[in-house]
Curated annotation (Swiss-Prot):
Pfam families: 4HBT (PF03061). This is Putative cytosolic acyl coenzyme A thioester hydrolase-like. Keywords: Cytoplasm, Hydrolase, Lipid metabolism, Repeat, Serine esterase. The keyword Hydrolase applies. One of its GO terms (biological process) is acyl-CoA metabolic process. Homodimer. It is found in: Cytoplasm. The lineage of its organism: Eukaryota, Metazoa, Chordata, Craniata, Vertebrata. InterPro entries: Cytosol_ACT, HOTDOG_ACOT, HotDog_dom_sf, Thioestr_dom.
Length: 252
């Protein structure tokens, strides 16, 4: 729901009265906080706001609240910052220019520009990990990184894709969270919940018919939490000329 709310407001903003029609594609999810659980029977309220635009991207801040329909009580359950890029409807490989947003104060633009530069640097710093491959280890020792490693393989079908036959970002995020959950449960031997996601980078699009390999490994543990790195690789089985590539990565 958070991803869809951001996509709606971003697509509305990047389609002016005159010009090429485009759709907003999710490029990065900043640190996502899971503050409170949402219970069965509660109503979810999702609100999205555009807080900054650069030449080719837009920053959206999304809050999710839960409402108890019996008592009327509301509480903030999730909040996240997302970055979208406008892709042309006629050529999805073409990134269009983003219309500017009107700020109430000059400080808002300056703060947004700082956040933009920060996330851009972070994306560049994580690019060196794009060559990493999580290799399985035979008979690993318990309570080691190799022992907790987990992977899932998924064939991308039509129900996973958009109108342009590319995978929905939310589908990839769901499977990444499942891999992290399996890995954490294997290490801790108990049920766990996701507390936060540091950042998800969507580096490349995944087409219908590709095989996704989602791999996870532990990078740090404390007394009450674990940090997990999840990587998504894609193999295009219908096009043998295209090599395996890194599609997304996250620390959770």
């Amino acid at each position: 729901m958070i991803k869809e709310a951001g996509a709606i407001i971003s697509t509305r903003h990047c389609n002016p009265q005159n010009g090429d029609r485009c759709v907003a594609a999710l490029a990065r999810v900043e640190c996502t906080h899971f503050l409170w659980p949402m219970c069965i029977g509660e109503v979810a309220h999702v609100s999205a706001e555009i807080t900054y635009t650069s030449k080719h991207s837009v920053e959206v801040q999304v809050n999710m609240m839960s409402e108890n329909i019996l008592t009327g009580a509301k509480k903030l359950t999730n909040k996240a910052t997302l970055w979208y890029a406008p892709l042309s409807l006629t050529n999805v490989d073409k990134v269009l220019e983003e219309p500017p947003v009107v700020y109430f104060r000059q400080e808002q633009e300056e703060e947004g520009q700082k956040r933009y530069k920060t996330q851009k640097l972070e994306r560049m710093e994580t690019n060196w990990r794009n060559g990493d491959i999580v290799q399985p280890v035979l008979n690993p020792e318990p309570n080691t990184v190799s022992y907790s490693q987990s992977s899932l393989i998924h064939l991308v079908g039509p129900s996973d894709c958009t109108l342009h036959s590319f995978v929905h970002e939310g589908v990839t995020m769901k499977v990444m969270d499942e891999v992290a959950g399996i890995l954490a449960a294997r290490h801790c031997k108990t049920n766990l919940v996701t507390a936060s996601m540091e950042a998800i980078n969507f580096d490349n699009k995944i087409r219908k018919g590709c095989i996704k390999t989602i791999s996870g490994r532990m990078t740090f543990t404390s007394n009450k939490s674990v940090e997990i790195e999840v990587l998504v690789d894609a193999d295009c089985v219908v096009d043998s000329s295209q090599k395996r590539y890194r599609a997304a990565s996250v620390f959770t």
